Regions:
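Short, well-ordered amphipathic alpha-helical segments that serve as non-catalytic structural scaffolds
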Residues: 1-4, 104
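Generic beta-strand or strand-like secondary-structure segments
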Residues: 3, 13, 54-58
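Short beta-strand-loop/turn "lid" adjacent to the catalytic site in phosphate-handling enzymes
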Residues: 4-48, 72-86
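Phosphate-binding/catalytic loop of phosphoryl-transfer enzymes
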Residues: 49-129
């Protein structure tokens, strides 16, 4: 940051990429002690984005500012029927790059003159974070 001309004290808050926490709705969340516990002992496994929550907390604590994470990969907004796998006793789980996909879908909806909620889009994440 300093190499780019910024100091941590220049910011009012920090935001890290969310990791594999418990399933939650899409949104912006304050990095809580529970979020820290979840990424330290991830309920759904390791993911590089778990570091985003830890780094945001660390930077926030250093500067005395709030730390947030947004649309983690554990976002679950699937309908009940979408959780049906076709195998008795086995449900489908929701894991996807919510931050990337929701961001581009919001941009596409705006270009179409629609709200995110009314747009009907197919978004494909082809890697790269």
């Amino acid at each position: 940051m300093e190499g780019a001309g910024y100091r941590l004290t220049d910011f009012d808050a920090v935001c890290g990429r969310g990791g594999l926490l418990r399933h939650i709705p899409s949104g912006t969340y304050l990095v809580s002690d529970q979020a820290i516990r979840d990424v330290m002992d991830p309920p759904y496994g390791e993911h590089a984005s778990n570091l985003g929550v830890l780094l945001a907390r660390e930077l926030g604590d250093m500067a005395g500012i709030p730390a947030f994470f947004v649309d983690p990969v554990c976002v679950d907004e699937m309908t009940p029927v979408a959780h049906v796998s076709g195998f008795r006793g086995m449900q489908r789980e929701s894991f996807f790059h919510a931050l990337n996909q929701k961001s581009i879908a919001r941009k596409a909806a705006k270009l179409l003159g629609k709200s995110y909620e009314e747009a009907r889009l197919t978004v494909v994440h082809v890697g790269g974070g």
